[in-house]
Amino acid sequence: PVTAGDFVYAWRRAASPELASPYAWYMSLMAVEGVDAVIAGEAPLDSLGVSAPDDHTLVVQLSTPLPYFAQMTTHATTFPVPQAVIEEFGDAWTQPDHIVSNGAYVLSDHVPQERSVRVRNDMYWNNDATIIEEVVALVINDENQALTRYLAGELDRTEVPAGQYPRLSEEYPDEALSFPR
């Protein structure tokens, strides 16, 4: 089971100067107490303003009020990571055979710069309501090529290339959707 300690471990990893996470800047934007000193290596990891008084409670201290803080916790940098798995497998902890998933799907295959495949997670709390068996995400670097494949029925969804939304929303009013990122 996921515990509050898994969040603390993840947030400390993100701010760790030893690991030099490419998303350390995100922790700084979140205004977590002490984050800049931790990232700079001027303070120990346990001085970061995040703690877990028990398995079900995460306490975050901010250095300044941040009205959008809750929304910032939807970024993957803030997701829990299992310390025991990382310690056992090191850099291979994110491989399909080792990665721990908390959601409706688990990673079953990953080919960098090509695709990732996820299958239903039997351990998911609401697995009975999960109706899609497998999700395949393809890496398509050209939005126009992706749109062509979508229109040919090869993809279920894609990003809309810049400037094409007005035309697509007229031609495909039930399919072309716009929402904030």
Annotated model-derived regions:
Residues 108-119, 123, 136-181:
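Extracellular/periplasmic solute-recognition and catalytic clefts
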Residues 12-20, 65-67, 74, 78, ...:
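Sec-exported extracytoplasmic/periplasmic mature domains
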